[in-house]
């Protein structure tokens, strides 16, 4: 049976798919209306219509394909191939949004260049994004579409015939004058955006991710918002595309901000702010999955620090640059876009070497702190002490640009951009402990992340290993490398995921008397260096006793975190 399944997979990969591509190339001259939108060789008509959840049983001979797709794409890629490229979506806007009329012919509301950066995307998801874009965006609201392939290197994107197919398909069915740039080497999100922006012709730029689906009326509110006031960056509400069923799910309106560790937080809107919905509201932290911005302004602020490399840098620096140049970030509830955001744990698997990711993010944060935060950097280093030992590199150019723009102090950012958020713990709380997490039995062994197994293990302690520098934070999670948290798996083994600050399996307490680390009702225990798990608490069990380097007992006691 396994041999048969393997033969079927090979036939599809090397015979069916190439033949399908060849047929598509032959049919590219036909009208889209007569073909009903290239369903794809595996799609099921009607599946996922109106953004509904899709359910299909996976045949036994396709289990391997299903599993491998999950491991790489971080969502149900097997199902994604079976949902038509063109599907309807629900209109989840407030009823008042649907009645609004925008002066789209005014001189102030300029059309945009729409820019998409992608790398190693699943073809059907990318094409579904593009179809939803062109079919739900009036042509007079944008003058060009720029697609930048940041040196994709998976099987499909490495094949010349596949690139020909993609380019021809886009020009025939998406936009006849779309500009497609296939970069010869990977440059990263920030540089790819800057490159595309330098090529753009419109007075406004709209950047979009490759894993989104657009709803009716998404673009007009964004362009209207940036037309009303100069130096405005506008973002939509990002709804959720479920990674298992691809269902379109409504998100509630929230406000982005940064805490003292420069970690992004989503906090509820105040009652006063909610009473003014669905009108736009200002936020402190931008989400760059979809955003609109005046082109000249973006060019002015795009080259602050060319040495930042992705992974948490783009959104953080852009938020600061907007504030520095007298701008504002505005969330627009009348604009809604579905976003396929995989679970954090799966997201980690895709990028592999977590140690390098942690080093990269730490260096990014160090550069941003040294350039932007001024007198308050000591407060931030208190939450990120491991950054003190990291080299930030040459900062002459970003500091020069910072001074040229006459940026105000970081205190002004806190006071001006985050008013009314003082009730949020992130702004004024102190963490409970930081440093190494060691076993009392083997005090030279420290809790460390294993990027390959997705588990945690014990390794010889090192002051230079950023993946051993833990913080028991004010929100009672145990985090490392800025935004990675220890998490209890359903099988009670200890793993990790990106922090969500919502408790649950990421909630931790420390008992300084018994030296036990507790998550909910169970205690952290080890049997050897590779086996760390949660078990019934036993104060007499030496393998449940842990040491945290720097414990703030007074804060623990005042917060009643001590058990």
From Swiss-Prot:
Which residues pair up as cystines? 97-334, 446-461, 485-499, 523-537
What CDD domains does the database record attribute to this sequence? beta-trefoil_Ricin_Pgant8-like, pp-GalNAc-T
Q: Where in the cell is it found?
A: Golgi apparatus membrane
Which keywords belong to this entry?
Disulfide bond, Glycoprotein, Golgi apparatus, Lectin, Membrane, Signal-anchor, Transmembrane, Transmembrane helix
Topology relative to the lipid bilayer, per the entry, is: Single-pass type II membrane protein
Q: Which residues are glycosylated?
A: 50, 389, 428, 464, 469, 552
Q: Which domain of life is it from?
A: Eukaryota
Which Gene3D superfamilies does the entry link to?
Answer: 2.80.10.50, Spore Coat Polysaccharide Biosynthesis Protein SpsA, Chain A (3.90.550.10)
Give the span(s) annotated as Catalytic subdomain A. Answer: 109-225
Q: Which Pfam families does UniProt cross-reference here?
A: Glycos_transf_2, Ricin_B_lectin
Q: Does the keyword Iron apply?
A: no
Protein name according to UniProt: Putative inactive polypeptide N-acetylgalactosaminyltransferase 12
Organism, scientific name: Drosophila melanogaster (Fruit fly)
């Amino acid at each position: 049976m396994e041999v048969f399944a393997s033969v079927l997979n090979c036939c599809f990969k090397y015979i069916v798919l190439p033949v399908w591509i060849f047929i598509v190339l032959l049919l590219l001259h036909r009208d889209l209306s007569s073909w009903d939108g290239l369903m794809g060789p595996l799609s099921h008509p009607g599946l996922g219509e109106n953004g509904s959840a899709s359910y299909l049983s996976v045949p036994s001979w396709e289990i391997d394909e299903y599993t491998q797709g999950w491991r790489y794409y971080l969502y149900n890629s097997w199902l994604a191939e079976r949902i038509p490229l063109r599907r309807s979506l629900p209109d989840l806007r407030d009823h008042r949004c649907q009645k609004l009329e925008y002066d789209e012919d005014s001189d102030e509301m300029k059309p945009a260049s729409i820019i998409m950066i992608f790398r190693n995307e699943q073809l059907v998801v990318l094409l579904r994004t593009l179809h939803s874009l062109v079919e739900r965006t009036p042509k007079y609201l944008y003058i060009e579409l720029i697609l930048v392939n940041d040196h994709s290197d998976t099987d499909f994107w490495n094949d010349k015939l596949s690139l020909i197919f993609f380019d021809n398909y886009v020009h025939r069915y998406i936009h006849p004058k779309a500009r497609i740039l296939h970069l010869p080497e990977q440059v990263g999100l920030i540089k790819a955006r800057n490159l595309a922006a330098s090529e753009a012709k419109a007075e406004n730029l709209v950047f979009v991710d490759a894993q989104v689906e657009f709803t009716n009326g998404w673009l007009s509110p964004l362009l209207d918002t940036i037309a009303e006031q100069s130096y405005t960056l506008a973002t939509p509400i990002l709804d959720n595309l479920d990674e298992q069923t691809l269902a379109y799910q409504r998100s509630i309106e929230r406000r982005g901000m940064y805490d003292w560790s420069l970690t992004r937080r989503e906090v509820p809107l105040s009652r006063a702010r909610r009473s003014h919905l669905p009108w736009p509201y200002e936020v402190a932290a931008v989400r760059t999955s979809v955003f609109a911005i005046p082109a000249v302004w973006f060019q002015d602020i795009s080259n602050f620090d060319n040495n930042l490399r992705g992974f948490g840098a783009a959104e953080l620096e852009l938020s600061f640059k907007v504030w520095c140049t007298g701008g504002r970030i505005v969330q627009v509830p009348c604009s809604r876009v579905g976003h396929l955001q995989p679970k954090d744990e799966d997201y980690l698997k895709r990028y592999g070497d977590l140690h390098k990711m942690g080093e990269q993010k730490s260096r990014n944060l160090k550069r941003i702190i040294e350039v932007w935060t001024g007198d308050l950097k000591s407060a931030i280093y208190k939450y990120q002490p491991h950054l003190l030992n990291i080299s930030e590199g040459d900062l002459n150019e970003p500091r020069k640009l910072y001074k040229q723009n006459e940026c105000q102090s970081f205190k002004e950012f806190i006071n001006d951009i985050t008013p009314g958020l003082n009730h949020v713990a992130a702004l004024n709380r102190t963490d409970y402990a930081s440093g190494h997490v060691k076993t009392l039995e083997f005090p030279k062994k420290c809790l460390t992340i294993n990027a390959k197994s997705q588990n945690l293990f014990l390794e010889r302690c090192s002051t230079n290993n950023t993946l051993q520098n833990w913080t028991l934070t004010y929100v009672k999670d145990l985090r490392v490398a800025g935004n990675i948290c220890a998490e209890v798996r359903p099988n009670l083994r200890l793993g990790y995921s990106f922090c969500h600050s919502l408790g649950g399996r990421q909630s931790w307490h420390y008992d300084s008397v018994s030296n036990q680390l507790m998550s909910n009702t169970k205690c952290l225990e080890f049997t050897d260096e590779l086996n760390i798990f949660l078990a019934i608490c036993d104060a007499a069990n030496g393998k449940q006793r842990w040491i945290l380097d720097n414990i703030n007992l007074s804060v623990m006691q005042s917060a009643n975190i001590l058990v």
